[in-house]
Amino acid sequence: MIKLIATDMDGTLLNAGHEITTMNQEAIKFAQANGITVVIATGRAFYEAQTPVAETDLKVPYICLNGAEVREESFNIMSTSHLNHDLVHKITTALKNNHIYYQIYTNRGIYTEDPKRDLAIYIDIAERAGQKADVAKIRNNIQKRIDNGTLKVVDNYDSIEDIPGELIMKVLAFDADLSKIDQVGQALASSPNLAVSSSSRGNLEITHSDAQKGIALSAIAHQLGIDLTDVVAIGDNLNDISMLERVGYPVAMNNATDEVKHIAKYVTETNENSGVGKAIMKILKEENNLEV
């Protein structure tokens, strides 16, 4: 019987407009009304993850930054895992030596050295996903994040570690040269204290090895007294694999990578077609004998 459901956001719960469809919302509420906990598990920082959820009346716990931060439904922080100075130095040295652009995510915001480079990257990400990039909208969103303080511009990333209370949680790297970024990712992944994954082609998400979606989801299940065989995880990309491979019911989106589809028990429809909502309703009907 399913007792816990975890869903990724980008490419999974969210459509191309970064919205949670009505069907997805209704399916989540249906699960919650039947005593099932639904968790969002994302590579996004909390303030990025909460934005599309705030446009609905959903209330859920969050696994953020691939597990580097876990928040209760009330937004209280349950756990964090950050990168120490030596690990940050190892990561940034490898990226700089290979001329790979990156951003730094902390417990207080996202840091960039070059907002213009960010704009070009976000346009490229949209186009790689088969979307028509709305340059004006992307530029406005970047400026809005700078204005509200969630995207911070610095001359040099080295200054971040000098800020009292600032903890580096994730490094997000981008490069159009897929061979190069894969090679650097494999090299960094050889460190026993680093977890390296990806949320889209051409990026690397680097966290402490303790900060993985699967580890965070396992901790939540344990806290709730739920066996992992009674858990559903839904995702589309490499940073979802750590949770998909742990649960009894791994679900891949139809737009997922082949690696994700390979370990899934069930492949649902795409994120554009409310694949999350359809998967939830199908599984709860079959596994929990609920009338849907």
Regions found by a protein language model. Give the residues of each.
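Residue-level detector of anion-binding/catalytic polar loops
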Residues: T37, Y101, A195, Y249-P250, ...
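Active-site phosphate-binding/coordination module
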Residues: T22-K132
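Short active-site oxyanion
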Residues: G35-V39, K59-V60, K170, T229-D230, ...
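Short, structured coil segments at secondary-structure junctions
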Residues: T56-L58, N66, N98, S191-P192, ...
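Conserved acidic, metal-coordinating active-site core of Asp-based
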Residues: A94, R108-V231
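Residue-level signal for inorganic ion chemistry
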Residues: A31, T42, N66, V171, ...
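Mg2+-dependent phosphoryl-transfer enzymes with acidic/Ser/Thr/Gly-rich catalytic loops
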Residues: M1-L4, N15, T21, A189, ...
